[in-house]
UniProtKB/Swiss-Prot annotation:
It comes from Shigella dysenteriae serotype 1 (strain Sd197). Its EC number is 3.6.4.-. It comes from the Bacteria. Belongs to the SNF2/RAD54 helicase family. RapA subfamily. This is RNA polymerase-associated protein RapA. The lineage of its organism: Bacteria, Pseudomonadati, Pseudomonadota, Gammaproteobacteria, Enterobacterales. One of its GO terms (biological process) is regulation of DNA-templated transcription.
């Protein structure tokens, strides 16, 4: 290998050193100085791992002074190169630059430059890069993007709402499903879609303080969205880092109290340029035309500044008409400005609902009914569809569905309001109550008497709360270490129940964390019962581990002991037995407890066991909940209303449980009130809205389609390959779970999403739902998306060389595999990837420019090839450099046709879809005022920007592989 002083070479093994200069040569060794790092390297002349750097006409080079030059001619004299060309900055031509004056910090980014500079990647990295390009492009084109990656059951009505709302520009909607139907999950699905597509980047969630942790956990565990919790302390800290503290985070959760308490804080929130605002428990925002509450006014002010708003609220029937109108007013004050007019409008929807019911019943329609439908829809060419719907043909059902869809598009608040009820959604279990009446121990009787004397000045409410938890009264006098569990009959009953139901998973809920911890100790020490504990003092990771241990079938905990607050936001559908060791103070908390098991997807009837002590507030409350509200065995939408109306009487009975005179009458009155309210709610149900929110067959098909995509074996193979190449250790744990841990030889020292301790993953949705410690890996999971970014944003795998053993071809035959990428640059919020994601175009060229790619599929071809070590590869490249240049020029000439075809197809698709959506909404705007002007403007603006961006689309070479035929 001829070396001359002043020549420029690059290290094959340490490319980060930059360009080296030959500074010493003797008979056996050569010394290179690398000016950018100041380091020297001594190599053997005969077999040194370095590659000569030689540029060609057309290349752009940089001098050590920083100016650039386009090379037009290369001269060699005494082994040294001089480049002649035109300077980019001064346009001066005929400039000569000797290679010794080249910039030493040279980085080769183009695949061909890397190949010629000897920066040759491993063959498996090239294959991974191509697969990453291919799968990434395919995933953007897959239907229901953003709906496949969450750790949730595929429940049709939730998917229907999320699919409808998540694709809108700045959605402003009211989610008002009944309890247990998953409003939080629907909101999370919408957020996930909007964030993944780039339609939103900054999200603010406002929820009552008691639910903040639940939201934090749900967003992280189900959607991989890491929110920051802002309270007074965090806000004060952030003020040191930014003028507006909320600019320090993209995703924020705070409480209404936090927002309301400070005018400056509200101003900062309004100025923080959120894309989406989510408000949970929005029915607690009090409003009247004359006196809206401060909380309502604060949210109203925020809603004026934030483009997208999701309000989660109780059902409209529970709220009452005025309160329901107040929520809609937050979404669109221009549309909902007059309460009286709104009430009148609601009455007018009755004929539409009747028409929908008529169509769904499948009966033949009279001429009058057909005419009425035609008038309601108001389309000129509706006649053929009406005739088809009224015929006996096979198309009748689909025609009726289309008519129903058109009616719902044009009438009612269906674009801004979604509401599902348990009546309209299948899949809920029965709930069976088992009460166990137990005697009140003398120790408790004594403690209660003393407490009554000493606490005479306490309010009735405080006495009532004390009486619900006699063990705490006992501890007040005997000390925190008092062993109440030695005599409390509930403990004895619980141990007996658990030992006789060893095969059952049992969820035990009590009000306080201390009770849960004491029960765990007793169960473990006395009966050897495996019990996990779950309370608010534990970190999210500790709770995950406890939940995972409870979920394990054979070796897991039999019991999970939960405190009231600790169990928020967690669901354990795999268990169907629940023990309430004590009772919560109000019906909402009772429903929340039962809701841990009573979810869609629960496979068994729920057995609710309530051991209670006679002559205590527990005995009063268990009767009131069961006989007065029927709250154990059915959901109770009337609970809060009745609770508020009889609060004072109920508190007195709870505070003095031995004085029961008149209690039977109270229960009877409550039951009558409950039945009357329930009937009233049922009568007020909006069937039209339910049909729209539920989604019917369309929603079912959506769930089935995503379920099919869950079985994508390509993902598993790709992920394992990706983890191997990044350098992530994989340990198969069985049960469809794998433990990933970082290794010492990773491509990057800290891979986002992979902690030092490692993580457990699964590709199985059912396993992920049962095991909260296992992350559910899909194409949308951050681990995969970060891996794709790591490979595709750098030059990993962009140039390689392989040998093809094929005796049918002459030795030394050259093939060049080119991977071009066709793409358009645009802001993320345009969601250009719907039409033209970065798309790979593969070419396999021989030296005559014949493209053999269609004849030899990538994976088949890849299996026939053998790797070449880097040093041998560099020698091969140097030997055929001119031939490769010629083939590259042939590739450049051919790619334009393929790229143009892709770009034109994307333009046509974008124009067709966006124009159709705009036309549909413009037509509906004439008959449905719930379509906002700003939505139409945004779609038109989006269409124009998308078309302009596609006009600017181009292509570039992303990777290349040189293939040399051999017979050995």
């Amino acid at each position: 290998m001829p070396f001359t002083l002043g020549q420029r070479w690059i290290s094959d093994t340490e490319s980060e050193l930059g360009l080296g200069t030959v500074v010493a040569v003797d008979a056996r060794t050569v010394t290179l100085l690398f000016p950018s790092t100041g380091e020297n390297r001594l190599y053997a002349r005969s077999d040194s791992p370095v590659t000569r750097v030689m540029f060609n006409p057309g290349d752009t080079i940089t001098s050590h002074d920083g100016w650039q030059m386009q090379v037009e001619e290369v001269k060699e004299e005494n082994g040294l190169l001089t480049y002649i060309g035109t300077r980019r900055d001064t346009e001066e031509s005929g400039v000569a630059l000797r290679e010794v004056f080249l910039d030493s910090k040279l980085v080769f980014s183009k695949p061909q430059d890397r190949l010629f500079a000897g920066q040759i990647d491993r063959m498996d990295r090239f294959a991974l890069r191509y697969r990453a390009r291919k799968y990434s492009s395919e995933q953007f084109r897959m239907p229901y993007s953003g709906l496949r990656g969450q750790r949730t059951s595929l429940i049709p009505h939730q998917l229907n709402i999320a699919h409808d709302v998540g694709r809108r520009h700045a959605p402003r909607v009211l989610l008002a499903d009944e309890v247990g139907l998953g409003k939080t999950i629907e909101a999370g699905m919408i957020l996930h879609q909007q964030l993944l597509s780039g339609a939103a980047e900054r999200v603010l969630i406002i929820v009552p303080e008691t639910l903040q942790h639940q939201w934090l956990v749900e967003m992280l565990r189900r959607f991989n969205l890491r929110f920051a919790l802002f309270d007074d302390e965090r806000y004060a800290e952030a003020q040191h880092d930014a003028y507006n503290p909320f600019d320090t985070e993209q995703l924020v959760i705070c409480s209404p109290d936090f927002v309301r308490r400070s005018k400056q804080r509200l101003e900062h929130l309004c100025e923080a340029e959120w894309d989406l605002l989510v408000v949970d428990e929005a029915h607690h925002l009090v409003w009247s035309e004359d006196a809206p509450s401060r909380e309502y006014q604060a949210i109203e002010q925020l809603a004026e500044h934030v483009p997208g708003v999701l309000l989660l609220t109780a059902t409209p029937e529970q709220l009452g008409m005025e309160s329901h109108f107040a929520r809609l007013r937050l979404l669109d004050p221009n549309r909902f400005h007059d309460f009286a007019q709104f009430v009148e409008e609601q009455k007018n929807y009755r004929p539409v609902a009747d028409a929908v019911a008529m169509l769904l019943a499948g009966n033949k329609l009279s001429n009058d009914e057909l005419n009425m439908l035609g008038e309601m829809i108001g389309e000129q060419d509706i006649e053929p569809l009406l005739q088809a719907a009224n015929s006996d043909s096979e198309d009748a059902q689909s025609a009726r569905q289309e008519l129903v869809s058109m009616l719902m598009d044009r009438h009612g608040t269906s674009r801004v309001l979604f509401r599902n009820t348990r009546n309209g959604v299948k899949g809920f279990p029965k709930r069976e109550l088992h009460t166990i009446k137990l005697p009140l121990p003398t120790q408790y009787q004594t403690a209660i008497k003393v407490s009554g004397i000493m606490g005479a000045r306490k309010s009735a409410e405080d006495r009532a709360r004390d009486m619900l938890y006699p063990e705490r009264i006992y501890q007040e006098f005997e000390g925190d270490n008092a062993t109440w569990w030695n005599f409390d009959p509930r403990v004895e009953w619980l141990m007996g129940y658990l030992t006789s139901h060893r095969s059952q998973k049992v969820l035990v809920i009590c009000a306080k964390a201390a009770t849960a911890l004491q029960l765990e100790q007793v169960l473990r020490e006395r009966e050897g019962i495996r019990a996990a504990v779950f309370h608010e003092g534990m970190s999210i990771i500790e709770r995950d581990r406890a939940a995972a241990w409870f979920a394990e079938e054979d070796t897991g905990a039999q019991v999970l002991l939960c405190s009231e607050i600790g169990s928020e936001g967690r669901n354990f559908q795999f268990a169907s037995h629940m023990v309430m060791f004590d009772l919560p103070f109000n019906p909402d908390l009772l429903e929340q407890r039962i809701g841990r098991l009573d979810r869609i997807g629960q496979a068994h009837d729920i057995q609710i066991h309530v051991p209670y002590l006679e002559k205590t507030a527990q005995s009063v409350l268990v009767r009131w909940y069961h006989e007065g509200l029927d709250a154990f065995e059915h959901t109770c939408p009337t609970g809060r209303t009745i609770y508020d109306s009889v609060y004072n009487d109920l508190i007195n009975y709870l505070a003095s449980p031995d004085q029961t005179e008149g209690f039977d009458d109270l229960i009877k009155n409550c039951r009558e009130q409950h039945e009357a309210l329930k009937a009233q709610l049922e009568q007020g149900r909006d069937r039209l809205l339910e049909i729209h929110s539920n989604g019917g067959e369309k929603a079912q098909a959506l769930a089935e389609s995503i379920e099919e995509q869950d079985d994508d074996t390509n993902l598993i193979a790709f992920a394992m390959n990706l983890f191997d190449i990044i350098g992530i250790n994989q340990d198969d744990r069985g049960d469809n779970m794998i433990v990933l841990t970082p290794s010492d030889h990773m491509l990057v020292p800290d891979f986002p999403g992979l902690s030092e301790d490692g993580i457990t993953i699964t590709f199985d949705r059912e396993v992920a739902l049962a095991r909260e410690d296992a992350q559910f890996i899909t194409w949308e999971h951050p681990l995969i998306r970060n891996g794709l970014d790591l490979i595709l944003s750098g030059d990993t795998g962009s140039s390689t060389i392989s040998l093809l053993k094929n005796k049918a071809l002459p030795v030394g035959t050259l093939l060049v595999e080119l991977i071009y990428v066709v793409e358009a640059q645009a802001p993320k919020q345009l969601q250009l990837n719907r039409f033209l994601p970065p798309t790979p175009v593969r070419m396999l060229l021989d030296k005559n420019g014949n493209n053999l790619a269609a004849l030899v599929e990538f994976e088949t071809f890849n299996r026939q090839l053998n790797a070449v070590n880097r040093h041998t590869g560099s020698k091969l490249v140097n030997a055929v450099q001119q031939d490769v240049h010629a083939i590259l020029q042939l590739g450049e000439a051919q790619i334009e046709k393929s790229a143009r075809a892709l770009i034109d197809a994307a333009r046509n698709e974008a124009d067709e879809k966006l124009s159709a959506e705009l036309s549909r909404l413009e037509a509906l705007r004439a008959v449905n005022p719930n379509i906002r002007d700003d939505e139409l403007t945004a779609i038109e603006s989006n269409r124009q920007q998308v078309m302009e961006s596609l006009d600017q689309a181009g292509w570039r070479l992303d990777a290349l592989r040189l293939i040399v035929v051999t017979h050995q």
